[in-house]
Amino acid sequence: MNYIPTQTFYGRRWRPRPAFRPWRVPMQPAPPMVIPELQTPIVQAQQMQQLISAVSALTTKQNGKAPKKPKKKPQKAKAKKNEQQKKNENKKPPPKQKNLAKKKKPGKRERMCMKIENDCIFEVKLDGKVTGYACLVGDKVMKPAHVKGVIDNPDLAKLTYKKSSKYDLECAQIPVHMKSDASKYTHEKPEGHYNWHHGAVQYSGGRFTIPTGAGKPGDSGRPIFDNKGRVVAIVLGGANEGARTALSVVTWTKDMVTRYTPEGTEEWSAALMMCVLANVTFPCSEPACAPCCYEKQPEQTLRMLEDNVDRPGYYDLLEATMTCNNSARHRRSVTEHFNVYKATKPYLAYCADCGDGQFCYSPVAIEKIRDEASDGMIKIQVAAQIGINKRGTHEHNKIRYIVGHYMKEANRDSLQVHTSGVCAIRGTMGHFIVAYCPPGDELKVQFQDAESHTQACKVQYKHDPAPVGREKFTVRPHFGIEVPCTTYQLTTAPTEEEIDMHTPPDIPDITLLSQQSGDVKITAGGKTIRYNCTCGSGNVGTTSSDKTINSCKIAQCHAAVTNHDKWQYTSSFVPRADQLPRKGKVHVPFPLTNSTCRVPLARAPGVTYGKRELTVKLHPDHPTLLTYRSLGADPRPYEEWIDRYVERTIPVTEDGIEYRWGNNPPVRLWAQLTTEGKPHGWPHEIILYYYGLYPAATIAAVSAAGLAVVLSLLASCYMFATARRKCLTPYALTPGAVVPVTLGVLCCAPRAHAASFAESMAYLWDENQTLFWLELATPLAAIIILVCCLKNLLCCCQPLSFLVLVSLGTPVVKSYEHTATIPNVVGFPYKAHIERNGFSPMTLQLEVLGTSLEPTLNLEYITCEYKTVVPPPYIKCCGASECRSMERPDYQCQVYTGVYPFMWGGAYCFCDTENTQLSEAYVDRSDVCKHDHAAAYKAHTAAMKATIRISYGNLNQTTTAFVNGEHTVTVGGSRFTFGPISTAWTPFDNKIVVYKNDVYNQDFPPYGSGQPGRFGDVQSRTVESKDLYANTALKLSRPSSGTVHVPYTQTPSGFKYWIKERGTSLNDKAPFGCVIKTNPVRAENCAVGNIPVSMDIPDSAFTRVIDAPAVTNLECQVAVCTHSSDFGGIATLTFKTDKPGKCAVHSHSNVATIQEAAVDIKTDGKITLHFSTASASPAFMVSVCSAKTTCMAACEPPKDHIVPYGASHNNQVFPDMSGTAMTWVQRVAGGLGGLTLAAVAALILVTCVTMRR
């Protein structure tokens, strides 16, 4: 069975049925076996009569002069009405209609959906109860599979349905005669609001959500419509997420059915809940009348509730017994949430400090203080009940409390809560108070009782709320931003949280006994008294009237008031009545919910940009967090809380930095290669230029060059001196010898002893012609050698442009080579020039727009704050008790003998030393765990997904692909395969912890091995699973003498300790600029590695040569060039062309990156290109269509030290040499080389001459 409906012509939506014509038979109930055509004259007569009556009434109304009087509204004539309906018009409507008239008028969206639903949905009933709905969509009828029952339509009920457990649907073909009632459907779901039976449905991020309370069990199967009346989804259930509920739905995409099930989803089938009474089952919402009402039979009703406390329908039974299941009496209002409190009562409990440093039994004893809300609100539980008067009914400005055995009330206005100052009370209900309090080390609750006495209780409690966001503010700002937080929702409606109530114990009261002439009189005073006297026999029992015990003393009697027709909270300061406790449950108001909190925005810092550094001037109004990190391989994270004016200098590199001040968004900046001097000036300017860029390398290079010059000069001078000495030594040793003219000139010999040049040459011609020719050729040889050396030096230095030799870029894609390697850097454009025979060259541009590295996670457990559950102690008077086994986490049980507890009315037991107390305690998840918990995962192989923009020809399209070397995407007819990435790197360790939106690399303990006070002391698979493990070092202690309580010691929560000491999250210290996100856990835009690409581009993507412009005489002239800046170069290309058109433009060198991929060729023969380079003297080849030319430029350094964008070119890994610098180097090297060569030649020549002698 295909679960995608077929769109057909019969999809008429939210239009009323067409009016019946007189010549057609109305669809009305008719006796069987009646031919419709025979009724046509009767129907025509009826409708004609209706028309005449309506016209007459309208005419009378228009012509009447008398004032208007109240009249019954004329009902619209409908073809469906028959004679039987007309007879019943004047009858008195039944009471049910009267009640329905009081219902709230549905809103516009509800009315719209009711019109649509009128035809296309049908109730599903089980035993006469509606459990859900079936919907007609397209050509199919669909019903949720979990909804039990039969469709309330005979034609649909007999169909054969095919069930799908994957989609939780049952589906069948619609009968032909019902196709006109079906609804259209659509797979188009733009984000916004949609409609359903209970109002608006918000669709955002692929999730349908509604306000909590708008949907309930029984709504399963209801459709969600768009504004055109088309079905976009079918509701299956919902997951309570606090203020909103996420819907579980079945919906459609373009070609398939999908099911979305949020975590914690509950199916919304209205299953019939059954309860039990004396082994007889009955519907929980309809209890048997023995008992069925608390007001009639309170004690029996409480016992029945206690028997069913663990059944799913307990709260239905509780509501039915509190309202007595009488719809005439039960009115829905805000006071209905207080109905359950008439079955409960406040109590007196032990308080160690009643405000004056002394203990007492306080009516406002503090039971618990909860501070899970991140906005600083606390919830306090006390013994008194607020918002209820002494009669047990709701009264907002009253406080109900206990004095002795009697109920009293006081004004709520006198209620106060203190820490270091007065707290602001935000809400009260029952035993609970929610308030905002200033930080402090203690908490006190007090009120003025009916006698104007102060009733108070004070406990030690350290209140120091953690800041919301990154600023520690004390006053909520008028302006700021909204950040996620948790708070106690100010609602008294029933919630998922609950507290246990139990039957109170017998309260001892020595004032009930009085001594009268050797007898003891028990004064009942309208109460039931349980007494026990040891004087005589048979003086044990209960009485509701005054009773006298003869021949007895007060010391020999014990009396206690017994009352089991009300519950009270299961306080650990009040003993329980039975060893096996009988309990009930009531909802807790003010649930913890996810919300948003307005936090301030710190003043924008004053920013001063320097050379590779950033100075920020910070003016905090309150302690504010400053953090920054590098975006390179070494993040070097830094954080500091700042509470006064300071200046901080942040180093900025070419890799970039990210800093964040307070709650302001993070700022990313990159350094540019700015410097002083000029790369194309005089030597001192060039040296200053390079010293600003590479100070160490410049110092080393200049020092080496200077040393080379000095050594070259010294060597040349030494060689010249040696040659002169060798030249003149023979003549100096020979008496009367004359130095030849040539040697005299070369060796600077005195002329007085030398012959003339002609004489010397004549002498050599006569005596040694070989030496004559050597003497003549020596200067010429020296000149030739020098010229050759200079020529070779120039030829060697000419190609030593370091920018061409070194680059981080990737090789250019050649013709027919459909592979490339693109850098995994977001926003960095990669271009390839592709040539193909018979086609004009094409430029392919690939740009990574975003990457996502998502690891495979295995949830080990979740951990959160725990709560210690301490049941009321069981005190066995004059006897012994034993511990029982209980499957509870960290369960502890101890029996203490020889206790003698007291309550406010006297000793709880009659015996002195034979009494025992059974104390119990165990650990459970705190109620805040649903909102505040950490998840421990094991991370495995990460899968990388990239979003890449592909541009070639006229195509510019974005695609998303897995970078694994296997996933292939098709873009414009071309096939691309990306990956695998060159570097198998991930920022996640093998073990990670996810807390809210932060991720931490942490080696957590395995499941079942948690240690007290450490991360993982409480572990469970989910926030609701039953496999809770706890190790909190819980130990019970012996109770103090005379006091009813359960003392214990325990290690503080390891989760709360971890929250304070968890350190910097991976979000703030991930290398390579990774952005860490959750849901799911992933690292986005990590700039590491390269992505190989395989391409298969068809010929249709190219332009044929005959269709492309023919470009000739291409020349390049660079007008402006700023290196190391984002497209800071402008080049003008001139050319000749035969026709206008479009040509691909590409740089064949990695020295420069051209911004344009294609240009429009015009007949004027001139185009302008923008390029980016890191070279001071770039020389790169540019091609336009099939023509090529070389662009050469002299670039200046950028003026801005720091910019908010990264470079769009390949950076240099070796100091670059400008053309001017190379010219100066060549000149210096040529001069020194020539001098050195001359010295070498002279030395060689003189040596040769002297050796021949």
UniProtKB/Swiss-Prot annotation:
Residues 269-280 are annotated as: Functions as an uncleaved signal peptide for the precursor of protein E3/E2. Residues 722-726 are annotated as: Interaction with the capsid protein. Residues 90-121 are annotated as: Binding to the viral RNA. GO terms for molecular function: RNA binding; serine-type endopeptidase activity; structural molecule activity. Residues 43-77 are annotated as: Host transcription inhibition. The keyword Amino-acid biosynthesis does not apply. It is an enzyme of class 3 (hydrolase). Its EC number is 3.4.21.90. Residues 80-92 have a biased composition (Basic and acidic residues). Residues 162-167 are annotated as: Interaction with spike glycoprotein E2. The record marks W268, S269, R332, S333, A754, A755, S815, Y816 as: Cleavage. The record marks Y194, N227 as: Involved in dimerization of the capsid protein. Residues 106-120 are annotated as: Ribosome-binding. Glycans are attached at N279, N532, N594, N956, N1085. Residues 120-268 form the Peptidase S3 domain. Structural polyprotein: As soon as the capsid protein has been autocleaved, an internal uncleaved signal peptide directs the remaining polyprotein to the endoplasmic reticulum. This is Structural polyprotein. It comes from Sagiyama virus.
